[in-house]
Amino acid sequence: GSIALKGNTLSSDNITIEPEKRTISLAFQENSLFPHYTVKKNILLGAERNEIKKDKSINFEELINLLDISHILNKFPHEISAGEAQRASLARSLITKPDLLLLDEPLSNVDQSFKEEIQEKLKKILKNSKITTIIVTHDSYEAFYLGSKCGIILNQELKQFDDPYNLSLIHI
């Protein structure tokens, strides 16, 4: 398949966005933090490497407070929990305020007791920043809660794509 974004097309065969215009971030099911950097350095790394201007990025302090990770900024990945690492990875992907955010099971490692709170905060961040986001998840509640549009894929085929409240799981 392909994705059209701001007049540019991305596909597995062709990416036609010039490097200086690429603002795509991603976060995986497994955190991808660099073990030799602190959490703070991991989060800021994307913005620094891409020379993102402050007016283009999401406010660092606001982001770490929303994701409740201010207490782990000076720690290394091996010193924090899986849920904290997942939230730090999410912060790193959001800090650049990308045009497109790709998330693969972004909250799978977050404790259930904390998951709904993070979903609420993530929804707020995505809504306020107007980031186009594609989330792959097995958690239908998460998809319906976070998504303005949801697709249901079964046997590698898109069965439905609509507003979450219009989808029917019965006929699948």
Task: State where each predicted segment sits.
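ABC ATPase NBD coupling module
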Residues: 9-25, 49
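ABC-type ATPase nucleotide-binding domains, specifically the catalytic core motifs of the NBD
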Residues: 13-14, 37-57, 66
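Conserved ABC ATPase "signature" region
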Residues: 55-72, 124
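Conserved ABC ATPase signature
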Residues: 76-80, 84-86
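A short, proline-enriched helix->beta-strand linker immediately N-terminal to the Walker B motif
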Residues: 95-99
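Catalytic Walker B motif of ABC-type/P-loop ATPase nucleotide-binding domains
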Residues: 101-105
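Conserved small/polar residues in nucleotide/adenosyl-binding loops
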Residues: 170-172
